[in-house]
A protein has these predicted regions:
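Polytopic transmembrane helical bundles with strong interfacial aromatic enrichment
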Residues: 1-184
Length: 184
């Protein structure tokens, strides 16, 4: 029971940042959707880019603290796991237990979050983002915001929204797995 305060801290850390991330996502989305129609087209590009970058920053912060919370949970409940991870037979023995299966699922879920974020942000978004040089001139920015490019910008925002929702769902799953892991 001496490990209980650390375990509680790990769980609270994850819950806090899930709630924080959800709130930030809702706030950014609501602010963007209600305000973007009142902004002149040349400035919409800057605002879209600013909202996008802030949402991505919040996403990576959330992932960082999800990793910290997961590592803290694993350290508290399986303190010898890191030293045993170098020995394949001992690691297999740990992963064959119910707690080991939950730990493996938690690691897989966290890695999926990282891969999903990396794929969206490093592969998909660069193809849909507004070129920086186009932002420097209002006339070029206005020309860039044709119907085709508006569709691309909206597709990027939609992708970030789906990514954010996926992070919220996966983050909640990781928290549930952490609770199960600590109670088995």
């Amino acid at each position: 029971m001496s490990d209980f305060p650390l375990l509680l801290a790990a769980l609270m850390l994850r819950v806090f940042f899930l709630v924080l991330f959800t709130g930030a996502y809702i706030w950014f989305s609501a602010a963007f959707l209600t305000g973007i129609g009142r902004v002149p087209p040349p400035q919409r590009i800057r605002i879209t880019r600013a909202v996008t970058s802030r949402m991505l920053l919040v996403t990576w912060t959330f992932l960082l603290f999800a990793l910290i919370g997961g590592a803290l949970t694993a350290y508290v409940t399986e303190s010898g796991l890191i030293s045993e991870a170098t020995n394949l037979s001992e690691l297999t023995a740990i992963l064959s237990t119910p707690r080991g299966i939950i730990l493996a699922l938690e690691v897989v879920v966290t890695l999926l979050m990282i891969l999903l974020n990396a794929a969206i942000q490093l592969i998909y978004l660069p193809r849909t983002s507004v070129p920086i040089e186009e932002l420097e001139s209002p006339t070029k920015g206005f020309k860039w915001l044709s119907s085709k490019n508006t569709g691309r910008a909206l597709a990027a925002i939609r992708a970030i929204s789906y990514l954010s929702l996926a992070n919220i769902i996966v983050g909640a799953i990781a928290i549930v797995l952490g609770v199960l892991y600590s109670h088995i």
